[in-house]
UniProtKB/Swiss-Prot annotation:
Native organism taxonomy: Bacteria, Bacillati, Actinomycetota, Actinomycetes, Mycobacteriales
Keyword Hydrolase among record annotations: yes
Gene3D superfamilies (UniProt xref): 3.30.70.100
Organism domain of life: Bacteria
Assigned keywords, A-Z: Hydrolase
EC number per UniProt: 3.6.1.7
Name of the protein in question: Acylphosphatase
Length: 93
């Protein structure tokens, strides 16, 4: 992790489970050089945790809210923080 790395946690609401959303998110994150995961939650949301440069995380957030995702995103609630322990790769959980 670099000195200026950040951790983005995004809670994605809408029809985002069972539509390839986590796979799509993983692909975009890897293209941006981010590490982290996308996980289905029991309440129907997807939690996205990404670590890397602020610019790359901001771009991922733009993509999550941009309207060209699988399914339908109603809203995204994001939280920014310091990177936690190193995460290897970007996984679907």
């Amino acid at each position: 992790m670099g000195e200026s790395d950040v951790r983005l946690t995004a809670w994605v609401h809408g029809r985002v489970q069972g539509v390839g959303f986590r796979w799509w998110t993983r692909s975009r994150a890897l293209e941006l050089g981010l590490t982290g995961y996308a996980a289905n939650k029991p309440d129907g949301r997807v939690q996205v945790v990404a670590q890397g440069s602020r610019a790359a995380c901001e771009r991922l957030l733009d993509l999550l809210t941009g309207g060209n995702t699988p399914g339908h995103v109603d809203k995204v609630i994001s939280d920014w923080g310091e990177p936690a322990d190193a995460i290897a790769g970007f996984t679907e959980r």
